[in-house]
Structure formats: structure tokens, C-alpha cells
Amino acid sequence: MDYLPIFCQLHDKPCLLVGGGEIAERKARLLLDAGAVITVNALDFNDQFRAWEKDAQLTLVHSTFDPALLNEVWLVIAATDNQDVNNHVYASASERRIFCNVVDSPERASFIMPSIIDRSPLMVAVSSGGTAPVLARLLREKLESILPQNLGKLAAFAGELRSRVKIRFCKMSARRRFWEKLFVHDRLAQALASEDRERVQQLTELLFSAPLDDRGEVTLVGAGPGDAGLLTLKGLQHLQQADIVVYDRLVSKEILNLSRRDAERIFVGKASGYHSVPQDQINQLLEEKARAGHRVVRLKGGDPFIFGRGAEELEYLQQAGVPFSVVPGITAASGCSAYSGIPLTHRDHSQGVRLITGHVKHDTDLDWSSLAAEKQTLVFYMGLQQAEHIQNKLIEQQLPETVPVAIIENGTSTKQRVLSGQLSQLGELAQQASSPSLIIIGNVVGLREKLSWFSDQTA
């Protein structure tokens, strides 16, 4: 992060603006909106500046720049068309440790001005750090079209209720639930927009009198196969509302960072052959945190109901009487195959898909004869350690040794690597791969050369 995003309270604080033209005028409008006490320094000023001075909204100083103008100033903006003057202003401000913005010169500025979406008191700022101002502007325009115009009224109304909410609800979790109900209350938003104060009062009293369930809850969320962009919108919504996030090894840092900054994160990572936290302790942890009134997101890689032991955890919560819900995720078979250019079904090559756990032992009672049937795709989860056993059992059942296979390592991520070969080479390929990996077996793998689109490391 090259710049720390902050919002400055400049009301009644002296600020200096150097420049008297159109660019300086735009900056002056922002400072006026912020309630700053503005001194503007230039040799000449446009009509708007003269009008502002006439209305006593700011003070004009007709002169060349003098560093003495910086005395007792909180903030300065250099907005002239003379680079030497701008540099002089910046150097003088830096000597005095005063924040200075030089318009269109981020490399010569101690702070930069973002693109702003103004829904006062709600403010949204977008910045590219000066590297791509057009992109920042386009994002601002996009956000302007999405954010309702009455958000400011809703935010201001929330400010009026803050002290009452603190008195009414002792627990932070109860307050958060109240605010979330208020902010998604469509009828209240409409009443505020139409300035129907009587209706606003009625709806507000209903919110305060409605019982708030103080119990916590657990939401089982599938994080998808790796790429943070594959997290569902509903999964993102629950993640950003969670007080506590209990997550596994396969959940990426990028997805974790989408949670609230004040949310507690608890790692219970598990991998084949190693369990850092036993399953019964995970179950008890979820119950304990929910009973304490927290909103808990149990975040699992892929889809929690496909080899994720999600059902086991929910069975425990159901018996314990803890409320729960489920947000499905994109399972590894779907995500990794798509990012590798391997369709799981194809009219000419595969009429079905089998998802199989790779945690198979030599005495496991799998129906290997049905797995060796033609025109289907086999997807083995967590199968690296048993790859040679899988290879041998399928060949025993007359599945041709030449059937294409692929091992997808770190699928959908920037570290994705795909190892391709034939069934007879599966055990050998597995020795070159590491977890997490997915094994795909079937003629559809042969389409990868034509359909591959995602940049990865191929072997």
C-alpha cells in the first residue's frame, strides 16, 4: 500500500491554495465543501475566485508565492501551471512538515486527491495512487451509478440514532444486527427519501421494539477452488458480516482478506495425513462461538458438501440446537477443470462425471468395474498418495492404459500447474505433484490442447 487512505476533518482549519485558474477552482470547491478556512495565492484570479472573495467565502492574496503564507496552515495545494512554482510550494511545505498536494504530480506530493463519490455524510474515495487516474475516474462513475442517491440521508439518520442504539442494546453483536436490519429496510429508505418524518418514526419504533435474536449462528460457506473471484456474492456477503471466521488450509489469503478487519480468524487447517485441530474440537468450537452470540462463518475450500465434511459439522450443530445455514461454493472439479481447458462432459467423449474421494485404501470396497466404464469422466479429490493404486485398479478393469489423465495442482490460482499424460503414467505424474491437487481421468482431458485458456505452468 503506497498511500494510507484517510479522511481529514478540515472544518474551520486554515488551508492554503496556490493558483487562481480553472484547476485551482476545482480544488477550492472541495475545500469549501469541507468547511476549510481558505487563503488563495496567485498573481491573477478568475471570476469565480473574485465572486467567492466578494461573498467572504475565502481570502485572496495577489502576489508571488511566499513561504510565510504557510505559517499556521494545516494543508496546502499547489495548482498552478508553473512547475517551478509548484515545486517551490512543495519544498517549502515539506520543510515545515505540512501535507502538500501538487496537482497532476503525485511524485511531488505528500498526499493525493482521490476521485470522490459524495453521499454526505457517507463518502467513498477511489484512487490509483496517481498511476491510472482515468481508471479511478471510470470506477467512480461506475460506483456513482450503483450507489443510491438517498444513502446520505440514511447515513445521517443512523447518526441521529447512535446514542439511542447504545442504550437499547448492550452487546455489540445486537447493535450490529440492528444496524444491518435498518440499512436493508427498503420502506424506511423510501420514507427518508420522501422526507415522510411520520412514517420514518413509525418504522424506526418498530425496529427498536422488535425482538433481536441474541443467539449466534453458523454459516457454512464454500470458498471455491482458489481464485478469490470465484467466491459467490452470497458467500462474500456472509463473510463480510461474520464476527468470527473459522477456516481451512485451502482458503486463500485473498479470500480471507475479504472478511471484516475486526473479525476474529481461527485457523483449523487440515491436510491428508495431518489434522492440526481434531474434527470434534472444530465442532465444539463452532458451537461455543455461536452460543456466545457470534455470527460464525465456517469457511471451507471448494464446496463444503463435496468431500468437505460439511454435513458432519452441521449434524453436530443440529443436535446442539445451533442455527445454521449453507452457502455452496464452486467445487474443485468444476473450477479446476474449467481453468485447465478440460470440459467434464462432452457429447462425443463423456456422458457423465464421477466425483470420488482419493482417500482410498487397498481394501476399500469401490466398484472399480463401474469406474472403468466408457464415456465418463473420473475426478479424484485428494488422490495423490493413492494415484498408483488408482491407476492399477482401473487398468485391471480393462480401462485402456492410453486414456488421457491430468493432475491439476493449485487449480485456478496463479500457481496453477497441470501435468498431463496417460493412465499408465498416473503414478509417475503424481510423484511430481504436490497438494492440493485434483486428478481427472477420461478422454475429455485430450481436449485440453485446444481449449486451454488460463495461463499456467504445464508439464
UniProtKB/Swiss-Prot annotation:
Recorded catalytic activity of this chain's protein: uroporphyrinogen III + 2 S-adenosyl-L-methionine = precorrin-2 + 2 S-adenosyl-L-homocysteine + H(+); precorrin-2 + NAD(+) = sirohydrochlorin + NADH + 2 H(+); siroheme + 2 H(+) = sirohydrochlorin + Fe(2+)
Positions of the UniProt region annotated as Uroporphyrinogen-III C-methyltransferase: 216-459
Precorrin-2 dehydrogenase /sirohydrochlorin ferrochelatase: annotated span: 1-204
Residues the record lists as binding NAD(+): 22-23, 43-44
Positions bound to S-adenosyl-L-methionine: 225, 301-303, 306, 331-332, 382, 411
EC number: 2.1.1.107, 1.3.1.76, 4.99.1.4
Keyword Methyltransferase: yes
Protein name listed in UniProt: Siroheme synthase 2
Underlying gene: cysG2
